[in-house]
Amino acid sequence: MSKSKTFFRLMRYMLRYKGLSILALLFILMTSIVATAIPLLAQYYIDHYITKNIAKAGLYILIIYFGLFILRVVFTFLGEYYFAKVAHSIVRDLRNDSFANLQKLGISYFDKTPVGSVVSRLTNDTQAVADMFGTIFSSFLNTILMFVVTLSAMIALSWQLTIYMILFIPVMVGSVYLYQKLSSRLVEISRAKISEMNTKLSESIEGMKIIQAFNQEQRLIDEFGEVNNEHLRYYTKSLKVDSLLLRPAMALFKVLAYGVIVMYFGLSFESAGFTAGIIYAFIQYTNQLFNPLIKLMQNFSILQTSIISAGRVFTLIDNEEYEPEQKESDYKISHGDIEFKNVSFSYDGKRDVLKNISFSVKNGESIAFVGATGSGKSSIMNLFLRFYDYDRGEILIDGVNIKDYSSKELRNSVGLVLQDPFLYHGTVESNIKMYNEELTREDVIEAAKFVDAHNFIDKLEDKYDSLVTERGSTFSSGERQLLTFARTIASKPKILILDEATANIDSETEELIQHSLEKMRKGRTTIAIAHRLSTIQDSNCIYVLDKGEIIESGTHDELIALKGNYYKMYQLQAGMLNK
């Protein structure tokens, strides 16, 4: 998206707050009018009182002068206050829109996008937009209004000299354009480096246990320092362009303008009938004309940063990598019979990770998929949960194509238990209910008892109201898994997907987990993905995957008798494989 399109799109956000924006604009206009009146009053005071040595009457002028000054301060405050309010309202909307679209995006987006990059867009980049509206935009409008009002007053004093002053403006604008061309790329890279630093920080915090366990602290420090230095290098370059080009140029134009004023009044003081008050007022108006322009141009780098940041936010808002589309039909999953018919799938559109996968499982039955890492086990789960769309073939539930079910019906009918149990910050009860207000405390307790989680919950100080910290770090891995079991059972699913549900459980806890799983599977269609073959021996059918294809299938005993890949895997895990 071009910078001009980004800017005008931001303006549409601003139109949501027309009332506040108009109010802020009125206060800025009043500030400009009052600011313009002050030099005129000073001119009148100089010409009518100081030059004539009349001090007494000048006291009233002085009171009016200070009154106008106070009004200017008040109007400036109110204008900036309401613009800041509009700015942060826009940022709130941008964050809400970004987060709302984030919830719609498919797993494919999150699989390839670093967490820190997303966080950076929702926090740093949106804050940069607030800086634009709260500071730069109000300054821009103030400059425009001040320019118009001041120019009118200058023309009234001397239209000839005003023309000379106006000639400086195109040169100033040209300088800003040159500055923009030189610094735009530097600012863009600088913002990208901030996003990269956030990614490094996020990954470091999430993987701190592994980092410390493998003595990788120094490597992470070096990598973060390298990115940080890169950010500093590009930011310093942009500062050089700002300091060496923009600021000196603006200061030079101002000095030249003063020189023109002095020369003009010096040459035509007597013939044009200029007074000391007029000269003073004109110098003040020149300041009022140039100072806001200089300030605005000096802040142009902030404007550039804000536009670039807004473009990054809009990229997130406009992202349409949504999960596969589902029909809003009235189909209901009644039994949970599942069938895959010659299903093939590729993540990149080039290399198939699943090739002609076919299997079926009836209600109450349990099947399992085993195989080496990368064999396609998790891909089958991703397709069934509609995280990705398959390329060829067909997936049926109760004889109906999976695409014909609504997303709500599919999600409500499928219970998912992952290898790494995820608990939210809240209470034990809220984690089991998952904020489903239809579930009562009794439903929660019933689900916990069903999966043998009630015993350890009941021993907690606040029982079901006990606080769960982020990721449930105060619970053991087995306790976290039992809580996710209770969460799954509380939703009363017809189909269970178990993705390495016992992979991170110790042997002692595994027995309890296995007992819970047996009860969970009864009366439900179950698909399990497992590395521990001991956990799936009672499955109705076990499928062995290799490079995206089913190479063996059968019960545990049948596969052992076959003495193929499954047999070797089983022997290896049992520690009985001959070297």
What are these regions (language model features)?
Residues E325, Y331-K579:
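ABC-type nucleotide-binding domain
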Residues N53-A57, A153-L167, V241-G311, L316-I317:
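Helix-loop-helix
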